């Protein structure tokens, strides 16, 4: 018997990423935006299957896209993944632990976790503000990409991300991401153009507002993109094959191989497992 007691209750729900089954346009839009935090994305698949959904599109990281494809090849998972018709992934550098988000809120922003009502990692304007809405309605913001928030997350990189080279989701139907490393539209180039140069290329002012690179990797993905384009839901600027290849090579080669290469080599020397790519 004790006369006193205590318990610690931590509510992560206001800033923890989670899988969501969205069935309406508004629900999909509410889920939009980058989530720089790992979360069990595939848990939503079972929920979608239980709901009886017959045509399922899933958005996930490249590593989760690979898991989905493996499940789709295994008859034991037919009841869960049998109705997936589209796999959409993102260009991925890493997914930093929830502790990284907590560090941004408490140490970088100087706020209390228990006061948080919601967060956005990359609120407008582009390339993004780390935005924290408090329960009292106050909104606090700092530059996430250019203000140091993104770089601060590096020390919270999970081990599994340190030896991953899967950046542009080779097994997804469609891959979406920023235009970093594009020879014209990379965000670090956009403020360097003259008014004359901007007037000659209508993509540049649009890119300043935030432009998405779209990589189509399958016939199913192409049909989906073509339908969205025909309906006027999206506006696309087609790239010549050599330009697209140059962009994708830059995204891959200037990203994970440089950052993760030394880690992978060290693991090989130590006899530790690494991912094999063929």
Residue ranges and their predicted role:
Residues 1-278:
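Iron-sulfur-associated redox domains of electron-transfer enzymes in respiratory
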């Amino acid at each position: 018997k004790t006369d006193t007691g205590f318990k610690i209750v931590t509510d992560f729900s206001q800033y923890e990423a989670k899988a969501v089954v969205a069935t309406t346009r508004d629900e999909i839009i509410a889920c939009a935006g980058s989530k720089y935090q790992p979360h069990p994305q595939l848990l939503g698949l079972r929920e979608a299957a239980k709901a009886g959904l017959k045509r399922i599109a899933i958005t996930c990281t490249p590593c989760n896209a690979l898991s989905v494809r493996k499940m789709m090849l295994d008859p034991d998972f037919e009841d869960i993944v049998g109705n997936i018709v589209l796999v959409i992934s993102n260009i991925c550098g890493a997914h930093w632990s929830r502790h990284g988000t907590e560090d941004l809120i408490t140490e970088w922003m100087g706020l209390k976790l228990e006061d948080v009502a919601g967060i956005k990692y990359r609120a407008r304007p582009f390339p993004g503000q780390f935005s924290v809405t408090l329960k009292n309605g106050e909104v606090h913001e700092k530059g996430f990409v250019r203000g140091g928030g993104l770089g601060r997350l590096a020390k919270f990189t999970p081990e599994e991300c340190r030896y991953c080279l899967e950046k542009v989701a080779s097994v997804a139907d469609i891959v979406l991401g920023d235009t970093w490393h594009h020879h014209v539209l990379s965000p670090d180039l956009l403020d360097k153009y003259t008014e004359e140069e901007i007037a000659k290329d209508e993509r540049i002012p649009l890119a300043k507002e935030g432009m998405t690179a779209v990589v189509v990797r399958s016939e199913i993905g192409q049909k989906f993109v073509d339908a969205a384009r025909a309906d006027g839901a999206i506006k696309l600027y087609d790239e010549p094959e050599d330009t697209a290849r140059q962009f994708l090579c830059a995204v891959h080669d200037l990203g994970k191989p440089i950052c993760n290469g030394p880690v992978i080599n060290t693991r090989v020397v130590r006899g530790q497992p690494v991912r094999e790519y063929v």
